[in-house]
Design a protein with these regions (language model features):
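Acyl-group handoff/entry surfaces in thioester-processing enzymes
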Residues: 2-76, 81-173
């Protein structure tokens, strides 16, 4: 789309992290990292945008859909720090993830990290390049991720089929 072309140009002209969208979710209580990882894998399967990279063909950016590839959830444990330092350090780790430059051609343009403060407190960071997602879409992805996690935790069947409406369907409107 024209908007994505502008973001591609601006990404190349700047430091590269200005258009990273980050969302940080505090999780309290029992958290199963393996279920988060399974939920992320289903999101990547269902949403083509999360498997898309941007290549250059004859000087023009083009989207490339990559095949699904399972990945491991990145985890950081800061539980050894003094309790009063953990929340601030967790936010610093999440912001650092948000500020890392995405390589548009190599991808992926979507990354997550689970930061463990103690056995019942976590900060979950989701970062995606704005070329693939807007704020509204980020909220939808978060809701779907939480729903998938609940379904896995409750032993319910999970829909792994591609989402009926993809991000490019909205961009085309």
């Amino acid at each position: 789309s024209p908007g994505q072309r502008r973001l591609w140009f601006l990404h190349r002209a700047g430091s590269g992290s200005e258009y990273n969208m980050g969302s940080f979710l505090w999780l309290r209580g029992h958290v199963e990292p393996t279920l988060i990882n399974q939920s992320l894998d289903v999101l990547r399967q269902r949403h083509a945008a999360l498997r898309t990279t941007i290549s250059v063909l004859d000087g023009t950016p083009v989207q490339r859909l990559r095949p699904f590839c399972a990945t491991e959830l990145a985890m950081v444990d800061i539980g050894a720090l003094p309790r009063e330092q953990r929340a601030q350090r967790a936010l610093a780790v999440a912001r650092s993830l948000r500020n890392q430059r995405f390589e548009l051609e190599g991808g992926p343009l979507f990354r997550c990290q689970l930061i463990r403060l103690d056995s019942n407190e976590f900060l979950f960071a989701i970062v995606i390049h704005h070329i693939l997602c807007d704020g509204w879409s980020m909220e939808i992805l978060q809701r779907e991720l939480l729903s998938l996690y609940s379904q896995f935790a409750d032993g319910l069947p999970v829909n792994r089929l591609p989402a009926a409406v993809q991000f490019h369907d909205y961009v085309a409107m």
